[in-house]
């Protein structure tokens, strides 16, 4: 590689600066003599050699990441990934690269969810804000401010008219999502970080889970706490309600998942097989029943397991799928190299997508119990994922402070 005269002079000055600032006086003197440099050190060369050196390493890392992405994209082309036209929507899965990478949050993203009706999505963050985006154009719409600490979870009611959020500031807030986008109620009652919230399908109650080891039910109309469910021995990480509304599930640092009857305070079943904190859960849609039954094994008579079925992701790096009616783990999915932080079923029921601290999103073929696609999604831990029920989109959030929109095809 040939340097121009000017580049050579600048390099010599930078070397001289490096030798001088690091105390190599004899070498500096000899170098100055041989390179014919003046003794006047110019300020602009201060620390230049180190800067160039570190930027080369940074660029090298970036090049390697881009090469990995390129290889992935080429593989897609070579394998002749069927186009949208050749596949049914039930077979569309998220594919790289992302359609949009949305920035604006000033801290880790804790949750991403789609609006049930409009072309909107919502992200919650440790920066204490909730942001609303148009996922079809990638445009930022607005921020909801009111929490004073990390927003841990957000959820819509079935019509998408109300949004509920919970925070490490111990509060739960209800927001009008039709016109004013104002906070219409704030509910207090938990003694520690509120980690998760969910509406019951009818929309008249909200459930919340907390680090205080309890789950509470709140009446939307009044904001009063009407029930407290106890049983978990440690931090309750997530609460998710079954679509029919009669059951809800929670998972905890105590390594268990509990399924509760909504209208009583009774725990229907406790699921224990994970070897570490259970971070996330997701109810399987009815469409997933046949794939899960097939995966459950040869001894399983066709349609033997009636469900409902629940998926769970843990810090033990595994994903498990359970038949809640009998309290049985039907299958275990292995592949992530770190904590599993988010789960979402494909609305068609054939696939499950997961987000992990290994920075990837994985697409699991349920019927064959295998990972069929890995997306190197973020620069840091992936914390949350959602699959749109009607449009071919997946969204993910990360500790890298970005929200990404992935198109399925």
UniProtKB/Swiss-Prot annotation:
Stretches assigned to coiled coil: 54-81
GO biological process: cell division; establishment of mitotic spindle orientation; microtubule sliding
GO CC terms, sorted: centrosome; cytoplasm; microtubule; microtubule associated complex
Family of the protein in this entry: Belongs to the WD repeat LIS1/nudF family.
Function: Positively regulates the activity of the minus-end directed microtubule motor protein dynein. May enhance dynein-mediated microtubule sliding by targeting dynein to the microtubule plus end. Required for several dynein- and microtubule-dependent processes.
Domain remarks: Dimerization mediated by the LisH domain may be required to activate dynein.
Protein name according to UniProt: Lissencephaly-1 homolog
The encoding gene: Lis-1
């Amino acid at each position: 590689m040939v340097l121009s005269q000017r580049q050579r002079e600048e390099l010599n000055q930078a070397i001289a600066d490096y030798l001088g600032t690091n105390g190599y006086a004899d070498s500096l003197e000899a170098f100055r003599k041989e390179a014919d440099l003046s003794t006047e050190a110019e300020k602009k060369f201060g620390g230049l050699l180190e800067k160039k050196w570190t930027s080369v390493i940074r660029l090298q890392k970036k090049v390697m990441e881009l090469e990995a992405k390129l290889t992935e994209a080429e593989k897609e082309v070579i394998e002749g990934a069927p186009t949208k036209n050749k596949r049914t929507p039930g077979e569309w899965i998220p594919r790289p690269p992302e359609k949009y990478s949305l920035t604006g949050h000033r801290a880790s993203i804790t949750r991403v969810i789609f609006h049930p009706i409009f072309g909107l999505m919502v992200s919650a963050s440790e920066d204490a804000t909730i942001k609303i985006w148009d996922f079809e154009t990638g445009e930022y719409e607005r921020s909801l401010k009111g929490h004073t600490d990390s927003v841990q979870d957000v959820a819509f009611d079935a019509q998408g008219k109300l949004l509920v959020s919970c925070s490490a500031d111990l509060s739960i807030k209800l927001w009008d999502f039709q016109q004013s986008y104002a906070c219409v109620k704030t509910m207090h009652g938990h003694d520690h970080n509120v980690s998760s919230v969910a509406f019951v399908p009818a929309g008249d109650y909200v459930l919340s889970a907390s680090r205080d080891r309890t789950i509470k039910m709140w009446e939307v109309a009044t904001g009063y706490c009407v029930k407290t469910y106890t049983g978990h021995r440690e931090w309750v990480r997530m609460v998710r309600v079954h679509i029919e509304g009669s059951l809800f599930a929670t998972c905890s640092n105590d390594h268990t998942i509990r399924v509760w009857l909504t209208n009583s305070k009774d725990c229907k079943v406790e699921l224990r097989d994970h070897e570490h904190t259970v971070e996330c859960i997701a109810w399987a849609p009815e469409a997933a029943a046949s794939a899960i039954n097939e995966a459950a094994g040869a001894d399983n008579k066709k349609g033997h397991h009636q469900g409902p079925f629940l998926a769970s992701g843990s810090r033990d790096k595994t994903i498990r799928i359970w038949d809640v009616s009998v309290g049985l783990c039907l299958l275990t999915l292995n592949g992530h190299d770190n904590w599993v932080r988010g789960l979402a079923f494909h609305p068609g029921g054939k696939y499950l997508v997961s987000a992990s601290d290994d920075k990837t999103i994985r697409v699991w073929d349920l019927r064959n119990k295998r990972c069929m696609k890995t997306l190197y999604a973020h620069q840091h831990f992936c914390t949350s994922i959602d699959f749109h029920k009607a449009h071919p989109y997946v969204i993910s959030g990360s500790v890298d402070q970005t929200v990404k929109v992935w198109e399925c095809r």
